[in-house]
Amino acid sequence: MALWGGRFTQAADQRFKQFNDSLRFDYRLAEQDIVGSVAWSKALVTVGVLTADEQRQLEEALNVLLEEVRANPQQILQSDAEDIHSWVEGKLIDKVGQLGKKLHTGRSRNDQVATDLKLWCKETVRELLTANRLLQSALVETAQVNQDAVMPGYTHLQRAQPVTFAHWCLAYVEMLARDESRLQDTLKRLDVSPLGCGALAGTAYEIDREQLAGWLGFASATRNSLDSVSDRDHVLELLSDAAIGMVHLSRFAEDLIFFNSGEAGFVELSDRVTSGSSLMPQKKNPDALELIRGKCGRVQGALTGMMMTLKGLPLAYNKDMQEDKEGLFDALDTWLDCLHMAALVLDGIQVKRPRCQEAAQQGYANATELADYLVAKGVPFREAHHIVGEAVVEAIRQGKPLEALPLADLQKFSRVIGDDVYPILSLQSCLDKRAAKGGVSPQQVAQAIDDARARLAL
């Protein structure tokens, strides 16, 4: 049953109906629609539209419907209803008869769907926050047991300076902490209820919208009805949060794909998150990580698509806004799945310390230490930089690391270099010297782990 048939003398073309209907995806808002309807029934009592007994009958029927939906949400898709609002109203009328037709008094699908979607977003944000913190915790635990795993750090995918696997893990903890903060910030802005704004001009009934918002668990009610029914900022913000979060997960995946490769060999992934080849029996492919990396693109696409949908819309509601849900649902589902999968990847990962150490000792990652040593001897940094570059060329020519060059060879480039240079060039010295806050020194890494554990209550 359509909710708008009285104005029309012809039935909708079946092709238009299929094009127009949204039940196939907005069925996911069933629980929120029912919860919102219960609250609206209470509001109608306060303005005399419903008696207390009528409201009780409606609430009881809606609660029964809620349990039926929770038991089998797929039943909704067997209906020919236009959207979830039509489906809920139809089911309610089946249960309570003509009384069910009174529930929509003073309410529009415009404020109804805006409310449903915000309720869904609030619940989903809480799920995302939980998954985000679980991944942060997994990274912290992985860092805890790999504080002594020295590996090369990279710039331009070239070995740059030695770091530890723990320090690498903590870098992603920081990214995820920002993702968490963004979600919490978004939650504050979407925590306002549009219910009671009607189609665009507000409801004709003197409903206490602040009280209504409180019944639904919102912090407050919105302030302008035109804006309220056409506002999809929270959709854009959540898609933006998801896009940024997925970029972080994609980088995480790319790093581990490289670390797991035969060329690097720094880690080995668990059999539980890898797959084989149908042709090459030796292969162990990092499919979980590659899928995380690949799924990043669809989330970016959802954000771009929603921005383009909204950019030219006049106030207030337009049917274009029906396009807000599929992209949002898919993007947040994808982000949530990838957060869980990233945590699973860390569960069982093996860090190959000898190979990491070997790689850290290659590539002249201690060259900066030699430059700093020269600066400490009074050589201007720019000159020291040039001297070390020449020393690296000589080391490459001899096929040796810097610390293996004889003192006489080093002194060809600067007479200030003495025997005391060799301890400075050790990997441990390279790490120990980075002792400022945020650095890779063992003390700073241990402190960062302690701070993260305290924040996450581990």
From Swiss-Prot:
Catalysis performed (reactions): 2-(N(omega)-L-arginino)succinate = fumarate + L-arginine
Natural source organism: Salmonella paratyphi A (strain AKU_12601)
InterPro entries per UniProt: Arg_succ_lyase_C, Argininosuccinate_lyase, Fumarase/histidase_N, Fumarate_lyase_CS, Fumarate_lyase_fam, Fumarate_lyase_N, L-Aspartase-like
EC number: 4.3.2.1
Protein name: Argininosuccinate lyase
SUPFAM superfamilies tied to this protein: L-aspartase-like (SSF48557)
Pathway: Amino-acid biosynthesis; L-arginine biosynthesis; L-arginine from L-ornithine and carbamoyl phosphate: step 3/3
Enzyme class: lyase
Top-rank taxon: Bacteria
PROSITE patterns: FUMARATE_LYASES
Gene3D superfamilies: Fumarase/aspartase (C-terminal domain), Fumarase/aspartase (Central domain), Fumarase/aspartase (N-terminal domain)
Compartments where found: Cytoplasm
GO terms of biological process kind: arginine biosynthetic process via ornithine; L-arginine biosynthetic process
